[in-house]
Amino acid sequence: MKNKVLENLLDESSIQQQVPFSAGMRFPHLKVPANACDCHHHIYDRRFPVDPNSKLRPPDATVADYRLLQKRLGTVRNVVVQPSTYGVDNSGLIEALNQFDFATTRGVAVVNTSVTDAELKKMDIAGVRAIRFNLSQPGGATSMEMVEPLAERIKAFGWHIQIVANAEQIVTGADIWNRVPVPVVIDHLGHVLSVTHPSFGIIVRLLKRGKGWVKLSGAYIRSKVGPPYSDRTVVAKAYVKEAPDQLVWGSDWPHPTAKIDDKPDDALLLDLLAEWAPDEAIRNRILVNNPSRLYGF
C-alpha cells in the first residue's frame, strides 16, 4: 500500500515537471471548483502554415502538452484561441478543437472580411464562439476597420468579438465597442496600466452595461515588477470590484510573448485569482458561471 501511495506521488511530481512552457513544478494553492475554465490558451502545431506577416513563431505546444497543464491546475473546461502566428488560417484551431471534447472546449477564430458564411458555419459546428482582432500588431491579419462588418456577420451565430489592443487603442475604438451588435471581450486586463487611464473607465462602462467582458489573463505581459505582478493586481482587483459577473480567467499558456527561458509559473498565475477575488463565491463565478454564459458550456 505504501509503495502505491509513493508511486502516485511520483506520478504527480513527474506530471508537474513535464508541463512544457510553464515555470515551476508545484500545484496551485488555489483549489478550483468543478468545471473551472481556462478561457485563454493557444495551441501551436508546425503541421499548419504560418502567416508570413506574423511576428511570433513559438515551438509546438500541443493538445497533449496542454492536457498536462490541465492536470496541474485542475481546470476542466478550456477555450482555444487562434494565435496570430497562423493569421486567418484556422485549420490548426479546428484540428485542436476536434482533439478536445466539445462538452468542455470552445474556440476563438481569426477571420477577415473574405470569410464565407459556410466557413463560419463550419467553425460554429466545431465549437468556435468568437472571432479575435489582434490590433496590437501593426500589419497583422485583422484591423480596426474590420471590426464592425465582421461583428454584423457573426451576430446570427450568437458569437462575440475578442479584442487584444493597447490602452490607447481601447480609447480610440470606444465608439466601435459601443456600436457593435455583439458582446466585446477584452484580452489581458485590457493592457490597462492604471485605473486612472481613460481606457479603464471605457472598459468598466462596457462591463456594467453587460456589453463587455474582461479576461483576467496575461498579468506578466505588461508587468514592470515581475512575479507576483503586484502592479497588475491593482487593475485586476478594480475590475473584480466593479463588475465580477463580466470577468473570466485565462492562463495564456504557452505564453508566446515570453522568452523560452522566462516563462511564467502557471500555478502562480492561477493563485493570483485568490488575491484578486478573495471571495470564493465570486471566484467560482469567474471560473465557472461566467464562462458558461459567455461560451455556452
Kindly give the residue locations of the regions a language model identified.
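Mid-to-C-terminal alpha-helical segments outside catalytic/metal-binding sites
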Residues: M1-N35, P59-R77, P244-Q246, I260-F297
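Catalytic pocket-lining loop regions of alpha/beta-barrel enzymes
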Residues: L9-I15, M144-W249
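Conserved, mostly hydrophobic/aromatic
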Residues: H40, Q70, L93, M123, ...
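Hydrophobic faces of well-ordered beta-strands that scaffold small-molecule active sites
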Residues: A36-H41, N78-V81, T105-A109, R129-F133, ...
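Short, electropositive alpha-helical surface patch
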Residues: N90-V108, Y239-A243, D265-A274
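Active-site beta-loop-alpha junctions enriched in small/polar residues
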Residues: H42, P83-S84, V110-S114, N134-P138, ...
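Short, acidic/polar
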Residues: D60-L69, S114-M123, S143-V147, P198-S199
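Divalent metal-dependent hydrolysis catalytic cores, especially in the metallo-beta-lactamase
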Residues: D51-Y86, T104-V110, V128-S136, W159-I161
